[in-house]
Amino acid sequence: MKKLFLLIAAACVSLTAVADEGMWMLPYLQKMNIRDMKARGCKLSAEDIYSINKSSLKDAVVIFGGGCTGEIVSPDGLLFTNHHCGYGSIQSLSSVEHDYLKNGFWAMSRQEEIPAPGLKVRFIRSISDVTADILGNVPSTAGQQEYERITSENIASLTASLQEANPGMVVEVKPFFEGNQYFAFVIEVYTDVRLVGTPPTSIGKFGGDTDNWMWPRHTGDFSVFRVYAGQDNRPADYSPENRPYKAEKFLKISLDGYKEGDFAMIMGFPGSTQRYMTSYEIDDMLNVSNPNRIFIRGERQAILKEDMAASDKVRIQYASKYATSSNYWKNSIGKSRGILKLGVKERKQQQEAAFQAWAEKNTLPEEGYIDALPKIREAIEGLAGIDDHRQYLEEAFLRAVEILTPAKMFDGRTEIKYPEEARKAMAGWYKDYNAPTDRKVAKRMLKIAREHMTDLPSFYTEIVDKEFNGDTDAY
């Protein structure tokens, strides 16, 4: 469910009213939410927010890049998003000579707007509930493998059918609520996106890691881009002949401000939620996954930070990588503190005890409710050691040591079939790679993995110990 689904959260922010903290699927606004929204002060109809027959707010709220939310704010494709969302593209366009990260950038004309290769903006053209198509022929007794086989076949078949009916679009069928509901998204993807303006990092990332994930924020966290299209206003690869996208709908920004009690809502692309975790999963998060992530990323970030401070070139090369790593490093720190402070695990245990009491009183053993929680607990506890080692392999090696990345990016078949594309991709990767920095990181990761993992990868015993007498630095 990662960041690809248009949902809406609405809240009345009056001090005398309680916020309705929900995530609501747009196709169900008319049926489920709009009456309550209007009672709280919303002046829009459900069709003003989501419609497949006319332009609506869904046409102004877009997926920016890998999954951020952006909003179209002019009839000529001007787009606002967060600074941290545009950060990767801003970094990619920066150099020591043109240091947009440090100094910011503002195009004084459309001719000065800078193309951002690889950046995409996706417009959701329709959302439909396809649960019956995906789950209709899945037996209620299906095991996990059978369930995955049947649903995968159904998704492939439905995707192909919808793709044929929507030429020029991208179709994605995604599960919600752990596979209990499925939605199909028809998406139009624009690939000519240009940087219009960004504040310097001193504003866009003001407060750095200290300010991140905190409230209230003090950061000027914004950047400005523009979507370009072909002469027919459809998606087109970059060309000087392209023109600004003519928006079907754009957000009109009021300069009148707001007052207490005004209706407010958020529309966009949130990530997946963890609020349905059991107490056993929360315990694993507190004692395994979060501490591992905080420690391993903290060790790597210290090395990156030192090298970035010593060289403008390295600072630019690693700015986006550092920001990506530190984002969920800080998130893990805050999440653990919040769970402990708010007693989340204890509240979950109370809910589970109430559920267990209800199940034992009101259901039969063969219905599966009575032993549901014990089975979940057994599975989570059985995976604890495996997850610990898996996370070290992922965080300390696959994420941290960059020289391993090309092996994941390419294989012989790709390079033979698409040699020019492979060369371009490799050149782009090397542009932001500094071998001395990566070597320092690799040395540290090899050491901490040996210190913390009880079951090490075989190369430790077969190569590091035999050929280098256990010296990970020499290896």
What are these regions (language model features)?
Residues 2, 8, 15-475:
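Terminal presequence/propeptide segments associated with secretion/organelle targeting
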